[in-house]
Amino acid sequence: MTVAEAAKVLGLTVLCGDDSREIEGVYVGDLLSRCMSRVTEGCLWITIMSNINAVAVAALTDPACIVFCEDVEIEEDMLQRARENDITIAKSTLDAYALCVAFHNSCGEKS
């Protein structure tokens, strides 16, 4: 499933980046030091930690997309840094659990 397909199914708003990337897994985490060693290339990273350091972690780990859940505010400077580093950012009003359940259900037999 691509980021664009996930956005459609999950009701995500893609704010910047390449939504054609394939999603190869999911990681949920907010502690950025932990995320640096757990977010994997191509994953959908779900978090509420909407600060510019999340973009730095994504630049190191290369997820398909960072999804900021619970409708957290995303500052323009963070979006600008994401654009500069080719990081895809989306947001959702759902919480992390609801996003994971919806993503799992959308995968059907592939999960």
Regions found by a protein language model. Give the residues of each.
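N-terminal first-folded block
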Residues: V3-C43
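Feature captures the catalytic cores and cofactor-binding loops of soluble hydro-lyases/lyases
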Residues: I23, S33-L44, M49-S111
